[in-house]
């Protein structure tokens, strides 16, 4: 994937193991799915949003971050990579507020954030992910794997793939509505 990137003050140059794990996971998913709607939760520099639309040019991606600098950096990187038609970027403290009557779900959610927010956001994940959809979780240490898997398994998610790079782990999980 050819991505021009200025990380600025935002996380996500591609060199950190958690970001690299997400990129490996997107390449793995590229072989088996073709999502129409993607959410990048904690977009940082926008690298994962940009990678998703380079892999799936017809996909629409929503990039969200709690940090205003990250949103600004993502918007700049979207322009540099000429993918502004496919990616919307917004400031958000977690998942976006669902508008009444909106039932559009995502086929793929990527969340490269830390374990604690991944646990806190877990119960809301199924509200935004369609049954049969995938979620990529990263930003967690090997020592946190069991806790994260237990929480997501209890909500109907099943492990598809685990990628370990040094002490960092990235999961691909598939959601099945029960």
Residue ranges and their predicted role:
Residues 59, 66-177:
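S-adenosylmethionine
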Residues 9-94:
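Conserved SAM/SAH cofactor-binding pocket of Class I
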Residues 1, 35-37, 133:
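Nucleotide donor/acceptor-binding cores
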Residues 2-7:
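A short, charged helix-loop
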